[in-house]
Design a protein with these regions (language model features):
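Hydrophobic side chains in well-ordered alpha-helices
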Residues: 69, 145, 186, 263, ...
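An aromatic/glycine/proline-enriched structural segment found at the starts
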Residues: 20, 57-121, 277-316
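M16 family metallopeptidases and their MPP-like homologs
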Residues: 6-33, 55-61, 110-121, 146-257, ...
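Active/ligand-binding-proximal structured segments within catalytic/core domains
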Residues: 115, 124-137, 144-147
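Short, conserved secondary-structure transition motifs
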Residues: 1-2, 92-104, 212-221
Length: 320
């Protein structure tokens, strides 16, 4: 996917708005020039700094005893010397703040829409309930965003909301695309669903559907040695108790309608969402104002720089 692809731009920019200059929001190399600046020495230095045994995890799954596994690990890695690993500090993600950024692509007939905010970490005690709330909003299968945007209004072919939980925080991001002439309506309906999840208890059937999906999908994540190893590594990385692998489905079944509304009220900020629109600004600017999004920033696509504090290239770097 190219760095000028509207979907790539929308996905990269929403993470940047949500996380600021925290590494989770930092864009990767988004141009040929950026990739060309990475040298072999850079890769060697990175590997030497971070690829050390005291900064690594190992999971072995298969038909062998613990003693056999330890012996195999010792044989393969016994000579791997420990080294000090640097302590790294990060900028804190910015507090949720309403910000609407329009990346202008004149002539585009579709608009990529992203709506997002900061979220809880993977280790948060309400992780399962939050995950379920976002699945009801926009997860796999039947969900509210798809229902209102596609089934009811016919504004898009797809709509979803993703909960990305990391070690030091996470993000809620809703995404869809629509025709230029329906951009304002699609955005308004998307944001309204965030409010609705707070204000109205979910239907018990919605809850049961999300529970069935999550509980039913879990065995697929532990059905092969490779997938079991990945689950173990993930739990070790996040500092989670491995017993959670045995109790996960119970945790899912214990979530209630009240829990969904509670976490929605506690962790969603519908009036402070970051919003990204990538499309022809002239085609929908008036719609935004009519739908309650009077304040927005317009950035011509040729001027966009995700690494710049103001998201704009320096004057000498612009192509227009």
């Amino acid at each position: 996917m190219s760095a000028e692809d509207p979907e790539f731009i929308a996905n990269s920019l929403i993470e940047r708005l949500v996380f600021g200059f925290h590494p989770y929001g930092r864009p990767g190399p988004n141009s040929v020039e950026a990739l060309q600046r990475i040298t072999r020495d850079d890769l060697v230095a990175f590997h030497r700094t971070w690829f050390v045994p005291n900064n690594s995890l190992l999971a072995i799954v298969g038909d062998l005893t613990a003693d056999e596994a330890f012996a195999a690990a010792e044989k393969a890695f016994g000579g791997w010397a420990k080294r000090d690993v640097p302590t790294v500090t990060f900028d804190e993600p910015p507090p949720p703040t309403r910000r609407v950024v329009v990346v202008d692509r004149p002539g585009a007939v579709q608009t990529e829409i992203r709506v997002g905010q900061i979220a809880v970490s993977r280790t948060h005690k309400d992780y399962v309930a939050v995950d379920m709330a976002l699945r009801i909003l926009g997860g796999e299968g039947a969900n509210r965003l798809f229902g209102v945007l596609r089934s009811d209004r016919g504004l898009t072919y797809g709509a979803s909301a993703n909960f990305r939980a990391h070690k030091f925080g996470g993000s809620f991001i809703a995404e869809t695309d629509t025709r230029s002439d329906s951009t304002g309506e699609a955005l308004r309906l998307t944001v309204d669903e965030f409010f609705k999840l707070q204000k109205e208890p979910v239907d018990p059937r919605e809850l049961r559907g999300a529970q069935d999906y999550m509980a039913g999908n879990f065995p697929l994540s532990i059905e092969t040695p490779s997938s079991i190893a990945m689950q173990v590594l993930n739990h070790l990385f996040y500092g989670l108790d491995l017993e959670e692998l045995e109790t996960y489905r119970d945790q899912v079944d214990e979530v209630t309608v009240a829990d969904i509304q509670r976490v929605a009220k506690q962790f969603l900020f519908p009036d402070r969402l970051s919003i990204v629109l990538v499309g022809d600004a002239s085609a929908f600017a008036g719609q935004l104002k009519a739908m309650g999004f009077e304040q927005f920033e317009r950035i011509p696509i040729a001027q966009l720089d995700l690494s710049a504090p103001n998201l704009r290239k320096a004057a000498g770097d612009r192509r227009d």
